[in-house]
Amino acid sequence: MKKICLLLFCLFAILPLSARDYETVPGDMMQTRIYTLENGLKVYLSVNNEKPRIQTYIAVRTGSKNDPAETTGLAHYLEHLMFKGTKQFGTNNAEAEAPLLAEIELRYEAYRRLTDPEARRQAYHEIDSVSQLAAKYFIPNEYDKLMAAIGAEGTNAYTSNDVTCYTEDIPSNEIENWAKIQSDRFQNMVIRGFHTELEAVYEEYNIGLSSDMRKLYATTCKMLYPNHPYGLQTTIGTQEHLKNPSITNIKNYFSKWYRPNNVAICMAGDLDPDKTIAIIEKYFGSWTPGADVKQPTFAPLPPLTAPKDTTIVGQEAEQIWVAWRAKQANSLQADTLQLMENVLSNGRAGLFDLNLNQTMKVQRAAGGSELLHDHGGFFLMGTPKQGQTLEEVRGLMLAEIDKLKKGDFPDNLLPSIINNMKRSHYSLLESNRGRAGMFVGAFIDEVDWKQEVESIDRISKITKQELVAFANQFFTDGYVSIFKKQGIDSLQKKIDKPVITPIQANRDQKSAFVQAIQDAKVEPILPHFVDLKKDLAILKTKKDLPLYYVKNKENGLFNLVFYYDFGQCADNRYDIAADYIKYLGTDKMTAADFRQKFYELACDWSVNVGSENITVSLSGLHENMPQALALLEDLLQHAKADKEAYNQMVELILKGRDDAKKSQGTYFSYLYAYAIAGERNSYRDVMSEQALKEADPQLFTNLLKGLANYAHQVIYYGPMEEKEIARLIDLTHVSAKQLAAVPENKPYLEIPATDNEVLIAPYDAKNIYMRMYHNEGRTWNPEEAAIQEVFNEYFGGGMNGIVFQEMREARGLAYNAYAYYYHPSRKDRKEFVMTHIITQNDKMADCITHFNEILNEMPVSETAFQIAKEAVVKRLASARTTKMGIFYAYLNALRMGLDTSLNELIYQHLDKVRLQDIVDFEKQMMANKAYRYIILGDEKNLDMKALEKIGPVKRLTTEEVFGW
């Protein structure tokens, strides 16, 4: 009896580790396990063994909704501060540091209550001085060093209304080290490096000032949810609050919401669930739960019974948004909203797609829902054509809503939507990020996992009559409209940069915690690189077309690509042809018929024209591939030119070109292309307005039909066997018996930077976009590939790089800053160096000075080098090239003149790379070189004298940059 009792005791003693209770849902294709620890921590696990990596999200059910009203933006800048370390890492002496951090906190509480400008300047100077003392004990970026040491990728975080989420993609052999780091981070966070990080957040705020989409979203929320935090405050916060922060409020917020019973760990990838949950319990099980993490409740929203309009102003293209209020994310109304969204705007065959976009009645129109924890909304978004008013766009969109309410859409649209939803779900399962992202959404919005898993099944049972009835109840006159006009927003305020003394990088220092993680022994992951001779089959069709084949053994999806080795730089008319065919049909089928049929088959097609290649692609459900391919071939060969459709398309193209000038990010892309290649570059090399208007539309249908006459390759990834796909290509794909050589590419060649010069173009904003570019015409040397890879990790790569540390961490000069040494895309092209920064106008000269300092005298650290090198080793060892990536690795190797993949080449030489190699490489390639400074900004707000000292300043007009 005693033996039996002892046996039972031993059995139950090990149950928590090997057979812990968990929830599952029948029919869940991800086979998710959901655990709940005793302290309330939720853990979602899904196994996907495709590669030895795991996507991890740690999601906290709190966001800007819970920001204190007097310090909005708090949740977001707490997210930033979570990267600064704990008592164990990020510091070389936590005890000595603590009283200084406490003093900084008290000084900020006093500072935020001051209103006199001179008193504030003096108080900030004192904060800066104390911060200098505290910085002696601060080891910046130790969290990033830890992530680099374990081979993590995608180190980041995001904050929204209801969520703050921390992301890492880790090798599967580093779960324990990852858990050890994260448990300390989430339980023992220390706020340090505060004033420089807050300045980086303010730079992020500046970037948002130029985004009219942010304004539209914030204004829409304000009208939909006028007495709820969704409408009363934004995630980034107000300018005033960002400049008057409270460390005390941050600590209180962290203490309340960052508790295990308000957090979920979401993981998908190559993991053993039993071992993983045991590790998580080991490190997170003692985390103290919060006494009250219940989400706050707010007063009911006032009813919306009549239309409400408002107008905002911004530099980007005009738009209109129309929105209705909806229920929260975990209500079953979400099912009907998702179906309704797809009836209106699924990107291919919805009412907006066919009746507004296909017919070119507007520049663009779309619709969709956003469902949050407390409330939701359904949005319509429209952009006008040239000469069209926003009121007209709204009227056209509302007319489509009326069709929905009348049931004026095909009966087969609903089953087509279900097929496409299933296809999208299959695609999502291929991605660890997709799987883990679903877990985050369900946890944050308190959606039961069973409800999530069964959503497609429930939606498939909604009838057309039920949907129409719902639409009539939902789309009332209680909607809001936001008219976004084009112009300068006079409400935006300029704030001068604070005087910040750079904090020490201390990059040669290392905490005992970091050393312990580096010393931890893990079972190594052996690299497995794509074998260019074995991992894909290279066949020939009966028509002698090369066929590259990889079998999909995972699901019923396929990808088929016809690849042509010439592109826009050979003939820029193909880009227009690729757009034009979307609006055409044949003698037997209209353009709308084609869209509806492809959507019914749950297949997509596209013609993409790159600088040096053209691809015709088809993808979707395997069982429908033969019919979809026949449809595509029919359209390519028999497309019927339509003069009216062509003229309308030209109007859209010209309006789109004009709109591009109004977007800061798009404008800078054009400027950069002009700066490195001159007038003939991939952005400007397009048909002129005159050429477009004079062209015969038949020309463009002939161009695509004529692709059948040129040599090309076939790429296939899918479930078909080799002989089966070869037979289908022979039977269905149209190609000439004798294929002609493709037109000759005339590449866009970069202009060497032989002397310092400045190119500046005008854009009125509170910040500038700036790049420094160097190219001395040097051909890529494969023997240096490993050195270049480690150099980029060490110098410009991510949060642990020299650039990030010096420009953002030490000085608060930017939110976004990086630098890389780029190898060319083809072996006969040239290498180049590029630095990038987005910064407040009055920080430009500082950025230039400090960028040149680190370029000319690169900080050298053996400690930082070893971490960078190990990060590259672990990243490449755990990388796997799969699916379509196999083909592109093969094509890339051909272009680069390699007989192995580039990753394998780099890995083979990593062991020989030493710090001195990095130092020598940087001195030879980057230090004291001539640079072309490329700046987009408003001259009257910039230090032009500082620019003139660099070299000749060439002022470009907008017309010169764009070519129109």
Residue ranges with predicted function:
Residues 36, 94-294, 328, 359-519, ...:
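Charge-rich, well-structured scaffold segments of protease-associated domains
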Residues 4-13:
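Sec-dependent N-terminal signal peptides
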Residues 39, 48-50, 59-63, 86-87, ...:
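Solvent-exposed coil/turn segments that connect beta secondary-structure elements
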Residues 40, 49-98, 322, 332-344, ...:
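Active/ligand-binding-proximal structured segments within catalytic/core domains
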Residues 17-19:
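Boundary at the C-terminal end of the N-terminal hydrophobic targeting segment
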Residues 25-51, 525-555:
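N- or domain-start disorder-to-order transition segments that initiate the globular core
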Residues 206-209, 292-349, 381, 505-522, ...:
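His/Glu-based metal-binding/catalytic segments typifying zinc-dependent metallopeptidases
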